[in-house]
Amino acid sequence: MAIRVSDILDKPIYTTTAIYVGKVYDVMLDLNKGVISGLIVSDIQNGCLKDYVTDPSKKVVLPFNLITAIGNIILVKPPADSGYGFLKK
């Protein structure tokens, strides 16, 4: 399935357990492999990661391997612990 990057910008991101994470701000590309490596997530201050980052007004990188579905919203596997799979941007 092909999808345009512009089609996922500003889409809300939720865990598979229906907890709000944030919104897609941008996409990270791995130019060596030619694949999307992660999503840059904004609106962290309103999502489930706000207590796990030092500055919730910043953005975080969500590794692409955590994404389970892309549609009207983006679904991700919930982190196993406070920092699993999430990197500060």
UniProtKB/Swiss-Prot annotation:
InterPro entries: PRC-brl_dom (IPR027275), PRC_barrel-like_sf (IPR011033). Coiled coil: none annotated. It comes from the Archaea. It holds the Pfam family PRC. This is Uncharacterized protein MJ0916. It comes from Methanocaldococcus jannaschii (strain ATCC 43067 / DSM 2661 / JAL-1 / JCM 10045 / NBRC 100440) (Methanococcus jannaschii).
